[in-house]
Amino acid sequence: MLLLRWPTFCCLWVFGLGQLEQTELSVTRATDESAQISCIVSLPYFSNTAIHWYRQKAKKFEYLIYVSTNYNQRPLGGKNKKIEASKDFQTSTSTLKINYLKKEDEATYYCAVCRSGTSWVKIFAKGTKLVVIPP
């Protein structure tokens, strides 16, 4: 759980409070293609909100990447850019892109934000299942 260290240390976990929406229940793509998963964020101050992306395979919940206040994508996976996250400020949407798909990328992917109030709460969307099929 090393990957979950800093994004989750101060947050309670809450799923599906309606402030984040992943409209596709599942996405199917062939091996070696790319998949995009979108997350509509209905929160004030979208431009200042960091969007975090996770995936769950079996019982393993893994932190992947985040995109914050700027337009720049934050790639993961070196020069190959296996995983990228971006924000569209016009539509209040964050998109996760998984490139060079392999069978091991098959999982349920979740977007999340951390919101403050009397305490920090991490809010999750309901998730999108990625299915990877042979070419």
Swiss-Prot record:
Superkingdom assignment: Eukaryota
NAD listed as a keyword: no
Signal peptide location: 1-18
Keyword Transmembrane helix: no
Recorded GO CC terms: T cell receptor complex
InterPro entries linked to this entry: Ig-like_dom, Ig-like_dom_sf, Ig-like_fold, Ig_sub, Ig_V-set, TRG_var/const_region
Stretch list, region V segment: 19-114
Keywords associated with the record: Adaptive immunity, Immunity, Immunoglobulin domain, Receptor, Signal, T cell receptor
Annotated GO biological process: adaptive immune response
Start and end residues of each stretch annotated as J segment: 115-135
Alphabetized SUPFAM superfamilies for the sequence: Immunoglobulin
PANTHER family the record matches: NON-FUNCTIONAL T CELL RECEPTOR GAMMA VARIABLE 10-RELATED (PTHR19256:SF40), T-CELL RECEPTOR GAMMA CHAIN (PTHR19256)
Protein name (record): T-cell receptor gamma chain V region 5/10-13
Species in which this protein is naturally found: Mus musculus (Mouse)
Lineage of origin: Eukaryota, Metazoa, Chordata, Craniata, Vertebrata
Originating gene: Tcrg-V1
